Amino acid sequence: MTSNSEPRTDRFPVSAVVLAGGRATRMGGADKGWVELAGRPLIDHVLDRLRPQVDEILINANRSQARYQALAPVIGDDNPDYLGPLAGMQAGLAAARHDWVLFVPCDGPALPRDLMSRFRAALTPATELVVAHDGDWLQPVVALLHKSLLPSLTRALAEGERKIDIWFARHQMAVVSFADQPDAFINLNSPDELAAYEARLPDSATGQGATS
């Protein structure tokens, strides 16, 4: 019999949901997925990082849905009032084909290429969710959740909960450090942050090479 503390070693299928449903107020209201970095939309960089790691990709979006649909199936929040990332996670858990669902933001062009392999290594039979840590801070919108959490999340939203970390703390959570990849979860929440990050890229870094 497997102990609840022993890591899982099986290669199970994973769905991924790119969270693109926010208002992006610090980006001047622009749809962040379509803001360009090195000549390509941020969403393209994110999808490049995700495709080799997962078995299904969905995009959670509340606007530009037809445009996103050209890249992957689109799901909107159940509530139209922009309730935050937890609402996107609820929609993703409900729509995903597989039991484990990876969530990432649409403005994460440097997501780790070994994100899922490290998350898998952290799982035990008791684990309900896995969250990334950058060495200084928890990164709650980069997380692997089991679909069995959907009823709990639906209740939390109905009760007015909007804070991811508070809801996460109610469940069996594993935390995985990516301190060795300092840019993995770079914040690109404003035009200034985007420009500063792009300025650090090599002069030749365009297209897919920008996040290689």
Task: Label each region the model flagged.
Residues 8-161, 166-185, 191-205:
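Nucleotide and nucleotide-moiety/phosphate-recognizing core
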Residues 1-8:
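Intrinsic disorder/low-complexity segments
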Residues 205-212:
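Long, low-complexity, intrinsically disordered segments
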